[in-house]
Design a protein with these regions (language model features):
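Short His-Asn-centered micro-motif
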Residues: 82, 126-129, 175-177, 201, ...
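Short, solvent-exposed polar/charged micro-motifs at secondary-structure junctions
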Residues: 54-56, 134-138, 164-165, 237-239
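Loop/turn elements at helix/coil->beta-strand transitions in domains of secreted/extracellular proteins
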Residues: 75-80, 118-124, 150-153, 168-172, ...
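Metal-dependent phosphodiesterase/phospholipase catalytic core, i.e.
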Residues: 85-89, 94-161
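Cleavable N-terminal signal peptides of Sec/SRP-targeted secreted and luminal proteins
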Residues: 2-15
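Long, acidic (Asp/Glu-rich), low-complexity accessory segments flanking structured domains
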Residues: 15-79, 88-122, 180-189, 233-313
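Active-site-adjacent pocket scaffolds in enzyme catalytic domains
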Residues: 141-234
Length: 313
C-alpha cells in the first residue's frame, strides 16, 4: 500500500513552496496520523532535509535550509540528514569542515519535543560520519551507543529491517550510515541510493537532473527501499541546485545558461525557455526541486522513496 504521492506533495505545500529561502509558516505537522499502521516504512514516500542543521552558518556555500529543525518537522519533513563529526567522544554536527553550532543531543532534544506533541508521527534520521575525527578514545559506534542509551525511550530499537508505521510512531528510526559491529536501525546499505553530487560548475545541473529523473522512474518501479539526494555543492551553491536562481531570494530570476533558441533548441530540453523576443528565447536553468515536482505530477508516479533536498518550505 503506497501513500498517494500527489497528496503527500500537496500536503507538504510543495506546490506553493518548491523553493523557499525564507522561514515557512505553512504547517503540516500531523500528516502521518492519517496513515494506516500497517504501511511499511520502506514503502512510504517521505520528504526530508539534506544537511538538516545547515540553517546559515558558513554562508551560502553551507546554507541548505531556511527553516529551523523544529519548523522543518512542523511543515512535514519526516527525514533528517544529520552529519556527525566524532570529536572528543561526542558528535558535533558539521557540514564538511563547518561546525553547525549544535551537537547530536541538541538535535535529539528538538525531535523529542516535536514527537511529544505529535506522537503519531515518526522521524527517520540518517546518521553519517562527517569531517575528521579528533580527540576520541572510543569508536564512532561506541559514541553513538552512548546517545542511544540515554535516549532509549526515543530511538527505535530495531526488531527487523522492515518495520511498519505502527511500530515506530513517536520514535526516531535511525538510518545507519556508519560502520558498526551491531545493527542500530535501518542499514543504509539496504537502500538503493542516488547520492549527493559534487558540482564543478553550474552547468552540471542538467546532469544532476537527468540522474534524478532516471532514478525517480526506477524508484517508482521498485516500490521500496530507495533514497535520493536532490542536492549538490562545490562549484554551485545549494540554493542554485534547488532553485536554478541567480541569487537566493524567492523572487530572484533564474540564471541564464548563456544559450538561446533556435540555435541551441536541442540543448537542455527540460530547462525553461524565457525572455522570448522575435523568435529567440533564452534557455534558463531550473531548480531540481521544481523539475522533479513537475515531472512527478506529469508521470503520475505513486512511490517517491525517501528524498533529501534543500529549501523546501
Amino acid at each position: 500500500m503506497f501513500y498517494p504521492l500527489f497528496s503527500l506533495l500537496i500536503g507538504l505545500s510543495l506546490s506553493q513552496s518548491l523553493y523557499n529561502y525564507q522561514s515557512s509558516n505553512v504547517y503540516n505537522a500531523t500528516w502521518m496520523s492519517n496513515l494506516d499502521n500497517g504501511i511499511p516504512i520502506r514503502e512510504m514516500s517521505i520528504i526530508g532535509s539534506h544537511s538538516s542543521m545547515g540553517t546559515g552558518t558558513g554562508g551560502w556555500a553551507f546554507k541548505t535550509q531556511s527553516n529551523s529543525l523544529m519548523n522543518q518537522m512542523m511543515i512535514g519533513m519526516r527525514a533528517l540528514d544529520i552529519r556527525c563529526r566524532h570529536y572528543r567522544n561526542g558528535f558535533s554536527i558539521h557540514d564538511r569542515f563547518v561546525y553547525l553550532n549544535t551537537d547530536l543531543q541538541g538535535v535529539l532534544d528538538t525531535v523529542r519535543s516535536f514527537l511529544s506533541s505529535y506522537p503519531m508521527e515518526t522521524i527517520l534520521m540518517h546518521i553519517v560520519e562527517e569531517y575528521d575525527a579528533s580527540g576520541n578514545s572510543q569508536s564512532f559506534e561506541d559514541t553513538y551507543l552512548s546517545y542511544q542509551a540515554s535516549n532509549s525511550d526515543l530511538i527505535w530499537t530495531p526488531t527487523s529491517q522492515n518495520p511498519v508505521l505502527g511500530e515506530v510512531r513517536g520514535k526516531i528510526v535511525i538510518i545507519q550510515d556508519f560502520p558498526a559491529r551491531g545493527i542500530h536501525g535501518l542499514l543504509y546499505t539496504t537502500f538503493t541510493v542516488l547520492p549527493h553530487k559534487y558540482f564543478n560548475t553550474n552547468w552540471d545541473q542538467y546532469d544532476k537532473w537527468t540522474a534524478v529523473k532516471s532514478f525517480l522512474g526506477a524508484t517508482n518501479s521498485a516500490g521500496k527501499s530507495r533514497i535520493s539526494f536532490w542536492t549538490g555543492h562545490g562549484g554551485s551553491f545549494p540554493y542554485f541546485v534547488a532553485s536554478g536562481k541567480s541569487s537566493p531570494g524567492n523572487g530572484d530570476p533564474r540564471l541564464s545558461t548563456a544559450l538561446t533558441t533556435p540555435g541551441f533548441k536541442k540543448w537542455y530540453p527540460d530547462f525553461p525557455r524565457v525572455a522570448c523576443f522575435i523568435g529567440i528565447c533564452t534557455i534558463a536553468f531550473e531548480g531540481i526541486n521544481i523539475l522533479a515536482y513537475n515531472y512527478l505530477n506529469d508521470q503520475g508516479y505513486t512511490y517517491l522513496g525517501i528524498v533529501f533536498t534543500n529549501f523546501v518550505g
